[in-house]
């Protein structure tokens, strides 16, 4: 994750030179300040799903109320309808945060897909024989997916490597929305702890939780 060199030639700069008005709204995630854009309103780093911050062109940061997908969409529509120079052609980059890990759904979709079982990929139990780089990469769902950060099976008092990061993300919810969020996932976490899953059963549980939340985020 280096810093993007904004001084180099880029497509937005070429579009500006050709007479286009340029804008980017949403995830930038390149550390440096956007160049070649007449307008930008971007998320810090990859941003947050709930009540996200946005970096404005004057360098200030504004916390917006709502779900990030809706906010980015609304900001894009607002720029097209009210803020651009309609005498010029334009190019607008709409960079959604979704479906970046971790997958935190809009609250109205919390219960979507909960009765759906997603088919396991044919290579789900691949042992990566003969592929040392793939075998040593910490990207296997069963072994490496964080039970709190990725599947939201939070246990009070217990910590994983990414527990604090997870709590920071959901901590952006107001008290009413947080109560709704916790009511849903806490019941799943209690059931998960009671089942004491291990091995393949645990790996497949993680996969189903991942897929259900992923589907909610992209809905």
What are these regions (language model features)?
Residues 1-219:
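Formylglycine-dependent sulfatase
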């Amino acid at each position: 994750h280096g810093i993007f060199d904004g001084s180099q030639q880029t497509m937005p700069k070429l579009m500006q030179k050709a007479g286009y008005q340029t804008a980017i709204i949403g995830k930038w995630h390149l550390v440096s300040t956007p160049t070649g854009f007449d307008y930008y309103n971007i998320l810090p780093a990859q941003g947050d799903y709930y009540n996200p911050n946005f970096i404005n062109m004057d360098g200030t940061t504004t916390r917006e109320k709502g779900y990030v997908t809706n906010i980015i969409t609304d900001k894009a529509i607002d720029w097209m309808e009210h803020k651009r120079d309609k005498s010029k052609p334009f190019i607008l980059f709409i960079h959604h945060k979704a479906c970046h890990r971790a997958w935190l759904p809009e609250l109205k979709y919390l219960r979507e897909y909960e009765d759906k079982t997603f088919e396991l990929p044919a290579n789900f139990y691949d042992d990566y024989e003969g592929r040392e780089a793939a075998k040593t990469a910490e990207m296997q769902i069963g072994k490496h997916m964080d039970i709190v950060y990725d599947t939201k099976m939070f246990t009070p008092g217990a910590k994983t490597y990414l527990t604090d990061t997870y709590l920071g993300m959901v901590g952006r919810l107001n008290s009413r929305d947080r109560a709704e969020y916790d009511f849903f996932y806490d019941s799943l976490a209690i059931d998960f702890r009671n089942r004491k899953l291990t091995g393949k059963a645990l790996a497949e549980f993680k996969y189903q939780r991942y897929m259900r939340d992923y589907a909610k985020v992209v809905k």
